């Protein structure tokens, strides 16, 4: 597979924060973490989708919602905060994940149906027929909205969820392994910008010229590097997902 650098008008909102189907039970998250002068922030998440931005307060705000098996196992989701030297480390875990019951999820068009066991699913098939889109596993819908102080060096690692950046003032490094990165940037306030993927694409409508001097495109690897204005450094990487660079 060969990845492509694509310059396009990005007018379609991504579906990472829009979910079709009936409402599910969920638990709200609300946590704050103080940040001292000179500290940096490191975050590591597995399943959550993350929306991150900056604000003027000297603290980190972590909000969002958790739904695990329609609210039945929300208490398994934990946010962990540790400090090491000048670094604040934030991560999540799903406690006793191997013990959480799996569900059968069936998709019919835009409708999502969840069955607790095979007997329920087979009964549904008797009257509705078989579906080609069936998944078995824990039903998880976890979305985090995080605000960090402006101009604080921040690093995020996400495994399965997308990382969305509607606005960010300060040095930022994002690695979203499978979910991809969607960043909105004000070009004049961006210093060095680096975007990288292995099996996805890089899409942008920023005023940046793509040439052999600032881009490398090979089988299974695409890298773009540019200096757009004056400001902090941004690095966005998604080995298996897409990177979207939007003009703000």
Positions of PLM-derived features:
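Solvent-exposed coil/turn segments that connect beta secondary-structure elements
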Residues: 46, 55-58, 65-67, 84-86, ...
């Amino acid at each position: 597979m060969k990845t492509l650098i694509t310059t396009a008008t990005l007018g379609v909102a991504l579906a990472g924060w829009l979910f079709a189907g009936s409402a599910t039970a969920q638990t709200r998250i609300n946590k704050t973490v103080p940040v001292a002068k000179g500290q940096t922030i490191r975050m590591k998440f597995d399943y959550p989708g993350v929306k991150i931005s900056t604000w003027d307060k000297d603290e980190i705000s972590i909000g969002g919602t958790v739904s695990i098996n329609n609210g039945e196992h929300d208490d398994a989701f934990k946010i962990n905060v540790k400090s090491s030297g000048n670094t604040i480390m934030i991560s999540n875990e799903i406690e006793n994940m191997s013990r959480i019951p799996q569900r059968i999820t069936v998709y019919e068009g835009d409708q999502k149906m969840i069955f607790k066991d095979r007997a329920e699913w087979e009964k549904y098939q008797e009257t509705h027929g078989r579906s080609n889109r069936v998944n078995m596993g824990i039903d998880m819908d976890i979305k985090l909205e995080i605000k960090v102080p402006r101009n604080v060096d921040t690093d995020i690692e996400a495994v399965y969820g997308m990382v969305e950046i509607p606005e960010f003032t300060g040095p930022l490094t994002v690695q979203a392994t499978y979910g991809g990165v969607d960043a909105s940037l004000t070009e004049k306030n961006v210093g060095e910008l680096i975007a990288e993927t292995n099996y996805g694409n890089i899409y942008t409508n920023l005023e940046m010229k793509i040439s052999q001097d600032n881009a490398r495109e090979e089988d299974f690897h695409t890298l773009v590097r540019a200096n757009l204005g004056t400001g902090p450094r941004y690095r966005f990487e998604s080995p298996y997902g897409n990177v979207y660079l939007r003009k703000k």
